[in-house]
Amino acid sequence: MKTIFLSLFICILFLSCEKSSVSEGSAYSEAVYSVEFTGKWKAPEFGVPSGVHFTTILGMIHNSQTYQWKEGELASWGVERIAESGNTGPMVIEIDSIVALGKAISYVVINAPTPTGSNKTNIYCNSNYPYISFETMLAPTPDWFTGISSFNLYA
């Protein structure tokens, strides 16, 4: 079982990854992870402004030749749209292009939890595509988002 704790910006998010099955071969293996996204944006940890919410959590399972976003680099149009308006459409188009190039194999989509709730999904990855990246907008904010960039599930 792998557990990852993230503390980002003004809220604390808990992402728990549990490897539930693995099939291994000589040079290739697959894994299924159960991913739970839990919002911890509440008093007394943080003041909760009116209308606070997360947007749909959108990402991908990919290889080391790409990333969804990277700290210190200019945001793509898709990342910018999620951060500024919560619009996931441009990021879906970007991920489609990355999949078409063979650098990603699937989407990661988690319905937005309430500020203090959680949602869970299963993700499938393999030794050729071991990275997960995703993001969600923190609202109401000018352009804040949180997420994971190129986390290696096989490390």
Language-model features and meaning:
Residues 2, 22, 117-119:
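Sparse, context-dependent recognition of short Cys/His-centered cofactor- or disulfide-binding micro-motifs
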